Regions:
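Alpha-helical scaffolding segments of alpha/beta enzyme cores, especially the outer helices
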Residues: 17, 47-51, 78-88, 106, ...
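Glycine-centered small-residue hotspots that permit tight backbone geometry or close packing
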Residues: 4, 8, 87, 99-100
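A short alpha-helix capping/helix-coil boundary motif
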Residues: 28-29, 60-63, 85, 111-112, ...
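EAL-family c-di-GMP phosphodiesterase catalytic domain
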Residues: 37-39, 66-73, 91-204
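Catalytic core of bacterial c-di-GMP phosphodiesterases, primarily the EAL and HD-GYP domains
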Residues: 5-78
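Helix C-cap/helix->beta junction micro-motif
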Residues: 56-59, 89, 138-139
Length: 204
């Protein structure tokens, strides 16, 4: 394993620790752990990932592997075997940074990932490729559209058939005042501890 491999494994382990923390706190919160496609072509790297997954003893469905930098046929073909090994361990597969190329769509047909993540702003200038229209109806997968800041972005997300939409148009920023009024909020309590005030705003 190279130094980069070891660094990625350390970050992956930290991600597993975070998921485990929430799971033991009684919250079933899945986590998507990003991983460059080229690293998934290494058998020794997949062996190391498998050891980490088997040792964490998390239930199936909590660990999601986010594959990114999947840009050419070589990276797509070389990572398939490793991803199949991950799937046999109960890991769900997500494709990050989807751009709608024919090669990526063929890869989706082959792998059938559980999630596809699309940065919708990339289609503002030239519009959606024909292959992207009604994408949600073509595959049994969840589609996540991000960076929705314009009405055009939302229209494109609807044309794709996205199941989840994120961005400034969908989620305006939450002010500190609103956060302080959120009941049972760790963030609110952290802010309150830094800036004490006579009014507890519901946080006790």
């Amino acid at each position: 394993l190279t130094a980069t491999d070891k660094q990625l494994l350390r970050l992956f382990m930290e991600g597993l620790d975070t998921i485990t923390y929430w799971y033991r706190s009684g919250r079933f919160i899945p986590g998507i752990l990003p991983m460059p496609a080229q690293h998934l072509a290494s058998n020794s790297f997949i062996d190391a990932l498998s050891d980490l997954l088997l040792n964490c003893r998390l239930p199936v469905g909590l660990v999601n592997l986010g594959v990114h930098k999947l840009q050419d046929a070589d990276s797509m073909d070389s990572c398939v075997e490793g991803l199949l090994r991950m799937r046999r361990l109960g890991v769900l597969i997500h494709l990050l940074d989807f751009s709608g190329t024919s090669a990526q769509i063929n890869w989706i047909k082959q792998m059938e990932p559980e999630g596809i993540h699309i940065e919708i702003g990339q289609f503002r200038a030239e519009g959606l490729p024909n292959e992207m229209i009604s994408l949600g109806q073509k595959f049994h997968t969840e589609i996540y559209a991000s960076n929705i800041t314009l009405v055009k972005d939302l229209e494109n997300a609807m044309s794709i058939g996205a199941h989840h939409c994120y961005g400034e148009l969908m989620m305006p920023p939450i002010s500190r005042h609103q956060i302080l009024h959120t009941s049972d909020s760790r963030i609110a309590k952290a802010i309150f501890s830094l800036h004490p005030h006579k009014n507890l705003n519901g946080d006790k």
